[in-house]
Amino acid sequence: MTELETHLLNALEQLQQDYMQRLSEWESAFVELQKMFSLTQRDNAMLNERVMQLSQQVQHLSEQTERLSQLYSENWR
């Protein structure tokens, strides 16, 4: 094997090692992103449920306020 072939082989092996390292890093990052997505999805579902509950409370309070306003108006005629 010539010196040039040896250098090329070493360079190719180094490229392969670098590629495998980067691939491993990307795979790890992808797994972490999947976990983050799952947690965010769960949190969003919980927040959505809470928003719906609060919206119902606001609607209920609005209805109560309207009834009280009507009673007040009727009593002060």
Curated annotation (Swiss-Prot):
InterPro entries associated with the record: MbeD_MobD
Parts forming coiled coils: none
Pfam family, one: MbeD_MobD
Keywords: Conjugation, Mobility protein, Plasmid
Gene (UniProt): mbeD
Protein name: Mobilization protein MbeD
Domain of life, per lineage: Bacteria
TM region positions: none
Function: This protein is essential to promote the specific transfer of the plasmid in the presence of conjugative plasmids.
Annotated organism of origin: Escherichia coli
Family named by the database record: To E.coli MbaD and MbkD.
